[in-house]
Amino acid sequence: MFFKKITLIPFVMLINLYRYCISPFIPARCRYYPTCSEYALEALKTHGILKGLYLTTRRLLRCHPLSKRDYYDPVPCKNKKG
């Protein structure tokens, strides 16, 4: 668990750098709720690095001006096999 949290730090820092230093200077254009950066943070924390990056990449590829979608798109729940 500790190792998982440590490995997430660089990704969380990059996302926060974007959110607080870059995003305020560009127009808001995310077509989804939660925003793509919020989605990325939640995906990484919920699913870990590999699946979190996969989900984030898929989300970023869907979020563009030509997308016909404009809606609530939460991070999928983590499946617990039991």
Curated annotation (Swiss-Prot):
Topological relation to the membrane, as annotated: Peripheral membrane protein
Keyword field contains Protein biosynthesis: no
Subcellular location: Cell inner membrane
UniProt xrefs under InterPro entries: Membr_insert_effic_factor_YidD (IPR002696)
GO CC, alphabetical: plasma membrane
One Pfam family cited in the UniProt record for this chain: YidD
Keywords of this entry: Cell inner membrane, Cell membrane, Membrane
SMART domains attached to this UniProt entry: Haemolytic
Family: Belongs to the UPF0161 family.
Protein's job: Could be involved in insertion of integral membrane proteins into the membrane.
Name the UniProt record assigns to this protein: Putative membrane protein insertion efficiency factor
Source organism (scientific name): Francisella tularensis subsp. novicida (strain U112)
Source species taxonomy: Bacteria, Pseudomonadati, Pseudomonadota, Gammaproteobacteria, Thiotrichales
